[in-house]
Amino acid sequence: MPPEAKRIVVKGFDPRKSRQRQETYYVTMIDRLNMALQVVMAGLGLKTGYQELYSGVENLTRADQASRCFNILQHHMSSGIQLLKDSAESFIQLEGTETDTNACTVVVGCWNKWLERVEIVQNIFYYMDKTFLSHHPDYPTIEELSLSLFREKLMAVKNIQIPFLNSLLQSFENLHSSKSTDHAYLQDAMLMLHRTEMYSSVFVPMYLVMLSRFYDTESSQKIQELPLEEYLEYAMSSLEREDAYVEKFDIVRDKKSIRETVQRCLITSHLDTLTKGISQFIEKRDAHSCKLLYALLQFNHETEYLIQPWSDCLVDVGFKLVNDESKDDTLVQELLSFHKFLQVVVDESFLHDETLSYAMRKAFETFINGAKGSQREAPARLIAKYIDYLLRVGEQASGGKPLKEVFSEILDLFRYIASKDIFEAYYKLDIAKRLLLNKSASAQNELMLLDMLKKTCGSQFTHSLEGMFRDVNISKEFTSSFRHSKAAHNLHRDLYVNVLSQAYWPSYPESHIRLPDDMQQDLDCFEKFYLSKQVGKKISWYASLGHCIVKARFPLGNKELSISLFQACVLLQFNNCLGGEGISYQDLKKSTELSDIDLTRTLQSLSCARIRPLVMVPKSKKPSPDTMFYVNEKFTDKLYRVKINQIYLKEERQENSDVQEQVVRDRQFELQASIVRVMKQKEKMKHDDLVQYVINNVKDRGIPLVSDVKTAIEKLLEKEYLEREDNDIYTYVT
């Protein structure tokens, strides 16, 4: 068995006296807490005794005196908030104005004082707060009690709340007006509103009204005073400023409604003015302002309101360009520059907005194909001419920019052109000249562009063009074969002949000329050789396309003249003249057998241009039958080989007319062929359906007029390919 435990006896212990001492301690501690709370709530602070008070609250809480402590605490906090309320109310009434920012300062001051006093209370009553109040739902924590008292006993008082809110809003308005404002007390005020749960229900609605009123007034003034691009800068900076205020003053939860309010005032209210301003930015080539405008509209999903002004602006600018005949020389460069700028705007300023990109493409199609009168076909013609210039000059014409990039930009324009057959006709004429007269700067560039056209338009579009290149290459091989044959041994001079297939090349007028005997013998020799190799074929000579290198001995020096065959034949007539003798116009006409038009043009190029190997006597713009021509004995030039261009009298206008006529004829044939194909397949069709079907079939090469389709139908009716039944129904005749 374990030993018996010893009993300890406390002598003189009296339970009744112990309880009395406890009660005395509780009363004493309660009195001290009352005194301490009274001092704290009066704002006098406690110098010492924190530890004793803290221990006293802990002991009271452990002794189930927490409810008693809470009642004391609640009483003194209520008294304390009453003191602050009376102080604030009396000061605000003394100031006598609701909009004075002092009201906000006073309330924020009360709030900061209250926080300081509550912090002391929390330190003293920490144990009770954490072990009793936090675990009893019927009791608020000290923080909950303090916030509730401040909200209900101070902020709910109308004599304080209304002046405070008006004062706070005035402070924010001063802040927006760039007036001096203490940011720190505004931050304290916002913290107070958040913690007292008055932010959303009381402050935000009034703040939005203030913002609306402020920006409505300011934006209406700014839109009148500032240039539009500066107004956009102002609007964007205002939105960025509001975002900064939202973060700084902890208004993040209402950022969306604040931004929508500001955007409505700055953007939506002036939407018509702003969107129409796009025309100013386009004319000034101001991509930055376009970017600002789009960004501002995008905030409220209002970019759709930019589509029509954007489209109208592009069409207006485009029509000004294409309808101005005086701008023909620079039209393509201006269109390229305009298109490149707009592409930058769409890609960078409008963030690849597909709707605005589509509107841009439709605008280009509208003005490029909708010019007035003779300018209607100008873009197609001038693009072909500009390409010709680039291919003749090379990269020097593009300022050193790779031609592949330039061609790509040109083809972007080319895609908008409806009359691609017009472009093809001019391009075909120009490429023929470059190939036949060896005027192309680079065969590689020619083939590169041809490949790009093929990818853009298809092989049918480039079929004839590819045939032209094949003819030139075959001619090189054939001429080389001729030069190495026995037939070439008796040639009087070096000869190169291009043998062309009529199906691929433009049609040229047959201009007659009587060649010098030795020249004619050389051509006859080549023709005989060619026909011996190509049985069943026939050769037709086009002297107007010929060119020569002629060696000339002038008194001031020997030269080589790069000239046309017509010019060469005229100059060679002067080999028979003795010193100082001349030849009359009439004699030259007789010896060369040139027509008056060709001879006049040739003589003008030799005697009236900048480079003049001949002298006309008497001088005139147009020679008469008696006009005399002499060798220019003072002729000189810094170059040994001198290029003398032919003078084309009104040829460009005539060429344009000829091309137009040829295109019209080709279109009629193409329309008739398309109608026959359609009717052969359908057998019967209504008039309107047939017209629309045919237009859709041929639109890739050019959109025909409805009247042209009707004309083609009438011709097929005359040729009895079609029959017309009642109700405008056509039947195909097999």
Curated annotation (Swiss-Prot):
Protein's UniProt keywords contain Ubl conjugation: yes
UniProt cross-references to InterPro entries, sorted A to Z: Cullin, Cullin_CS, Cullin_homology, Cullin_homology_sf, Cullin_N, Cullin_neddylation_domain, Cullin_repeat-like_dom_sf, WH-like_DNA-bd_sf
One GO CC term on file: subtelomeric heterochromatin
Location(s), subcellular: Cytoplasm; Nucleus; Chromosome
GO molecular function annotation: ubiquitin protein ligase binding
GO BP annotation list: DNA damage response; nuclear mRNA surveillance of meiosis-specific transcripts; pericentric heterochromatin formation; protein ubiquitination; silent mating-type cassette heterochromatin formation; siRNA-mediated pericentric heterochromatin formation; subtelomeric heterochromatin formation; transcription-coupled nucleotide-excision repair
Coiled coil stretches, renumbered: none
Pathway(s) where this gene product acts: Protein modification; protein ubiquitination
Pfam family, one: Cullin_Nedd8
Superkingdom of this protein's organism: Eukaryota
Cross-link (Glycyl lysine isopeptide (Lys-Gly) (interchain with G-Cter in NEDD8)): K680
Modification after translation, per record: Neddylated; enhancing the ubiquitin-ligase activity.
Key words, A-Z: Chromatin regulator, Chromosome, Cytoplasm, Isopeptide bond, Nucleus, Transcription, Transcription regulation, Ubl conjugation
Residue intervals of the Cullin neddylation domain: 666-728
SUBUNIT field: Component of the Clr4 methyltransferase complex (ClrC) composed of at least clr4, rik1, pcu4, rbx1, raf1 and raf2. The cullin pcu4, rik1, raf1, raf2 and the ring-box protein rbx1 are components of an E3 ubiquitin ligase, whose activity is essential for heterochromatin assembly.
Its job: Required, indirectly, for activation of ribonucleotide reductase through the degradation of the protein spd1, thereby supplying deoxyribonucleotides for DNA replication and repair. Also has a role as a scaffold for assembling ubiquitin ligases. Component of the Clr4 methyltransferase complex (ClrC) which contributes to the establishment of heterochromatin by specifically methylating histone H3 to form H3K9me. ClrC preferentially ubiquitylates H3K14 and ClrC-mediated H3 ubiquitination promotes clr4 methyltransferase activity for the methylation of H3K9.
Family classification: Belongs to the cullin family.
Name by which UniProt lists this protein: Cullin-4
Organism (species): Schizosaccharomyces pombe (strain 972 / ATCC 24843)
